[in-house]
Amino acid sequence: MKKSIILSSVFIISAMITLNSCKKKTEVDDETQSVVDNAVCEQQFMAITPVVSEKGINQSGIKKINVGCGTWTILGAISGTNTPNVATDTLDSNADGFYDNGPVSFAIDYGTTGCLSFDGLSFKTGVIKLTTAKRWSVYNNPVTIDLQNYKVNNVTYSGQIIITRLDSVTVTTQVINGHCTDGNWNIDYEGTKTIKQVGGYSTPNNEADDVITITGNSSGKNRLGRTFTTNITTPLYKKSNCKWISSGTLELTPDGLKTRTVDFGSGTCDDDATFTVNGQTISFKLK
């Protein structure tokens, strides 16, 4: 009898182990928060570069102008003057005199009231501030971008961005200590990307038709505190008149979970995307 009880106990324990083992095998890794939060930060940080590039490269001389959504202003003084801000065209048509006094700062100011961007969905407030020791058109010259109370819809974006032009259509972008928050949740984001303008360069005064591709990698921490890393495997495609990345793929690895392949679609401007992990494909929204 005693031997029978022992055998029964062993059988029950073995059965429990087997059941638990089967249960673990059928668990689905469907964590989407890291994928969504990377997109929330990445899409807007990367969208800043073509806006800055459009204004910096194509600005003839120095003047304060409306830039569709926002106002472009130089924050500095021409050589030999004390003018703090330039509101009209100056005699220094090529702007070289501004750089005689050292680094020059510019601002794209969306104000506190804000305005609607070309995608029809992104409402912007705050300031994008640029600081550069040389003209924007100079290659291999790092330009520092600081975000001041910069908000898109209800999300505030902060951090520093270093942009370096490699050629007429290509820049590298490094996001340092990037942070995205709506006051209820917080996301950390850093990354180094190469951005190439593949559309809109023939219309220098029209931001609405700009199109860029993005390659590179990033890391961050999602709103639930889980860290993640990413690597773009097929260039991401972003139109300035679309809020979302519309095509391309990347690999994202949340801490403690399997690497998933994120697919942003085939080019349609929408917030639909998928990720595949362990052979299973899951749909999600880029919000």
Regions found by a protein language model. Give the residues of each.
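Bacterial N-terminal signal peptides that target proteins for export
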Residues: 1-9
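Basic side chains
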Residues: 2-3, 23-25
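C-terminal motif of bacterial Sec signal peptides marking the signal peptidase cleavage site
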Residues: 17-21
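Low-complexity, intrinsically disordered segments exposed to solvent
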Residues: 24-287
